Amino acid sequence: RVDNGTMRWYDVDLPAAMELRRSYYEDTERFHSIARSVLEFDWMNQLPDDPGERFLFVAEGLFPYLPEDGPRDLVIGLLRRFPGAELVAEFASQDVVRLMSGRFGRGKLRRRFGLSDDVWFRSGLSDPREPEEWAEGIMLLDEWCYFDESDPRIDWMRPFTRLESIGRPLFVARFRLG
């Protein structure tokens, strides 16, 4: 995270994850940690309620783990509470969600990252424009996939992305909310 010397950063995560983070860094005047589920919208009350305030929300490694309707509910909640904000979020395709929510995917998450059996991919998108259908005022501004540019570490996988069933497995999308 890059600090420009003026911005305020609010980090929202589950209490157990926040406790671990606090062992590495503390809150400051401009950095605030909020130990809540993003789906418990009362965390939004801790952010400034100034009509001139501009917000950028970043959801990295979050949406695939939320319940199926979680991303939609959160985006609509942000739209209603912070009109004019932007959201940059990482999404998984429906095919990746099916793969990672099965026995193989759960086992991989458990072995590789030490996650418990109740943590797995639960939600994905078929198309980056899908959130525009959730509510009026959600507008896709940009989207990109990890495979859009050449990188020697993952180039061997690029031919597979031409298969319709794989396509864009993980992608990032930027939206204007309202």
Question: Language-model segments: which ranges?
Answer:
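Alpha-helical subdomain
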Residues: 1-178
